[in-house]
Amino acid sequence: MNDTLLTLILIVIKLGLVLGTVLTLAAYMVLAERKILGRMQMRYGPNRVGWGGMLQPLADLIKLLCKEDLIPQRADRWVFMLAPAISTITALLAFAVIPFGAPLQLFDRSLPMVICDLNIGLLYLFALSSLAVYGVALGGWASHSKYALLGGLRAMAQMISYELAMGLAIVPVVMTARSFSLTAIVEAQQSLPNMLRHPLAFFIFLVAIMAESKRTPFDMPEAENELVAGFHTEYSGMRFGMFFVGEYLNLIVLGSMLTVLFLGGWYGPLLPGICWFLIKVLGVAFFFIWVRGTMPRLRYDQLMAFGWKILVPLGLLNILVTAAWLIWRG
Amino acid sequence: MSLWKDIKGTILPFWVTLRYLFRRPVTVCYPERKQTPAPRYRGRLVLTRDPDGEERCVACHLCSAACPVDCISMQAAEREDGRRYAAWFRINFSRCIFCGLCTEACPTLALQMTSEYELATRELLQVIYEKDELLIDGCGKNAEYNFYRRAGIGVVAPRGANPGESSPEDVKSNLP
Ligand code: SF4
Ligand code: SF4
């Protein structure tokens, strides 16, 4: 009884810590993105609120909370109100299975540095990222606006297509680790990160998660020039904010996924595991921002063609080759 | 070969953006560092006086006719000696687009543009300038020009007495 209670308390503490860290991280990711993009374009970026702009996320939050929250007259009220929540919650839920570090020894018991070490963690992650499509698609549909509908449709098509490539890219990883548990996958990379073992899978996965996060160069759903703002055109106030934060949460989730699956998770010399994990996730996030500052938007047909005609066949081929190699090695 | 070009064209921009990340921004941080506008900068409008210290504006309405956004209004009045002036003169700077067409239209050089650009305020009524706020003490960009000295017929000098003018013809004298 006492033991169960202790486990429960520990889980709640871990939950609170993870939630707090991730939400703060997402807020500051927005700031970091604006600052880095600014520097790449030889401007400063936000630097007025607080020390060098450090309180900007707070100011944004206050602004979003004070804004009028509009619901279009002929929108489907309930779906319209639920859609942003779906986007944010699916992203938050994903953190339940992501391992941040090696198990810790505390009170004579092993404390896993993951909220819940599911043995099908990877499938859980994929299920959630499929659900995330609903937030976008329903948001676009419920707004009763052509722009939002088109944006939602595009987002749906794009996310589903690239999810396929993403799924194919991780099959070799699962095959070498012989497990769906994320902790096991990280432990299998102790000597050599999967990035070097499966470079092709790494490339496919990287491109796929970029498309999945709906960011430049894959920001079709939002394409401001053609679609006003895509699926969240009709959203305002905190509802828009939830979509917005959802995007950055998603960025952290995908960065963590990339870290866990390909960059060797918490393994690294000198520093404690959790630091390495954070460094890797932030590195991936920086890379994403860098790409956004560099690449122009793709054309929609090119995007689809690239997904279906190049990434998916490559992914399949990669599985075959890996399987053959594994069998040959015995 | 074209594939190689494509790959190079994809990779190279990353290097460019990374280099720019470490350059100094060119942004001028405004309230701390103010820039001096060029002499012909089109900032806030003023009404100037002629070298004698009298108001130049003759309330001819040409400026308000030229203004594309209709933000100038005035009422004409006449002094004892026949000299025209504006009883009131109003410019609504919340509508002004600082195009300078009014100053082009002004025949007396009364209306001129300055390089003042800090007009922002939270009170909308504060950017509606009345005549006493517009009228300055100097001549502005042209210190010599005096409209009434040239054409202020019967006000400053009798007919034909202005510099460069010949006295009027007596139309009765050249009858056949
Ligand atoms: S500058 Fe242009 S807009 Fe402004 S008062 Fe003159 S004519 Fe009108
Ligand atoms: S400012 Fe110039 S154009 Fe306008 S009424 Fe006065 S004299 Fe005429």
Curated annotation (Swiss-Prot), chain A:
It comes from the Bacteria. Coiled coil: none annotated. It is found in: Cell inner membrane. The keyword Coiled coil does not apply. NDH-1 is composed of 14 different subunits. Subunits NuoA, H, J, K, L, M, N constitute the membrane sector of the complex. PANTHER family: NADH DEHYDROGENASE SUBUNIT 1, NADH-UBIQUINONE OXIDOREDUCTASE CHAIN 1. This is NADH-quinone oxidoreductase subunit H.
From Swiss-Prot, chain B:
It is a peripheral membrane protein. GO terms for molecular function: 4 iron, 4 sulfur cluster binding; iron ion binding; NADH:ubiquinone reductase (non-electrogenic) activity; quinone binding. Keywords: 4Fe-4S, Cell inner membrane, Cell membrane, Iron, Iron-sulfur, Membrane, Metal-binding, NAD, Quinone, Repeat, Translocase, Ubiquinone. It is an enzyme of class 7 (translocase). Binds 2 [4Fe-4S] clusters per subunit. GO terms for biological process: aerobic respiration. This is NADH-quinone oxidoreductase subunit I. It comes from Syntrophotalea carbinolica (strain DSM 2380 / NBRC 103641 / GraBd1) (Pelobacter carbinolicus). The gene is nuoI.
